Design a protein with these regions (language model features):
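Residue-level marker for buried hydrophobic side chains located in beta-strands
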Residues: 227-228
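Conserved core of the PLP fold type I
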Residues: 78-224
Length: 228
């Protein structure tokens, strides 16, 4: 009755496209100056188990429907690579990752305006391993980190596992992390690292403007705080 669902003849029921200017503003998180410990693992585990139930629509995580992925094309590529793989594919790579891959990434970094050396790069098995390594390098158990709110639950799990305390920084759908709020927190509370998802963050999908990105970098550089 709220106009969120519409019936289409001989097709079924569908979510109605929102009318222009009908966006509902999200309630922003309350700014708390003191860091807190998080305990989310049990709840996250329950949610992940529920996603395996075919009777449950998985709205709790940003998971792509398998039918939208090019599974057949990926399988063909993997099969081709497996047939052509040398004996090197059965061994161990150095801890920073396959040198040939890091060399190609270093070459590509020129187009990013960086010009990195292959020895400056570390490849990881997904983003969460990269975040774990970055936090290990910049924090110790008990330290405080700043994270946008709302955020991806995996980041809170990671903080919990590493015994880190978290300060939530309000985020907006249109602009991302509230830099004014972050600056206010940094003026009152020692923070060892700031974890910011600046491009289409999860779950809001916010894109921080280039001007705000530059402001964020300048703010943390002045205070010598790592930006992850």
């Amino acid at each position: 009755h709220d106009g969120l669902v519409e019936a289409r003849p001989k097709s079924g029921y569908f979510v109605r496209r929102p009318a222009p200017g009908s966006d509902v503003p999200l309630r922003r998180a309350r700014l708390v100056m003191s860091p807190t410990r998080v305990a989310v693992s049990s709840g996250v585990t329950a949610v992940m188990h529920s996603m395996r139930d075919p009777a449950v629509v998985p709205l709790a995580a940003a998971v792509v429907a398998p039918e939208l992925l090019p599974i057949r094309a990926l399988n063909r590529i993997l099969s081709s690579l497996a047939r052509e793989m040398s004996t090197a594919g059965a061994g161990y790579d150095p801890p920073p990752g396959l040198r040939a891959l890091r060399r190609q990434l270093a070459r590509r970094s020129i187009t990013w305006g960086l010009g990195l050396d292959e020895d400056e790069l570390v490849t990881t098995v997904g983003a969460m391993e990269a975040l774990h390594l970055a936090l290990r390098a910049t924090t110790r158990p008990g330290d405080a980190i700043a994270i946008g709110s709302p955020t991806y639950f995996g980041l809170l799990q990671l903080a919990e596992e590493m015994n880190l305390r978290v300060i939530e920084i309000p985020s907006c759908v249109g602009t991302g992390l509230d830099i004014d709020a972050l600056e206010q927190v940094l003026s009152h509370t020692p923070v060892k690292a700031v974890l910011a998802l600046t491009n289409f963050d999860n779950p809001l999908g916010a894109l921080m403007s280039d001007a705000n990105k530059e402001r964020l970098v300048r703010l943390l550089a002045r205070r010598d705080i790592p930006l992850i």
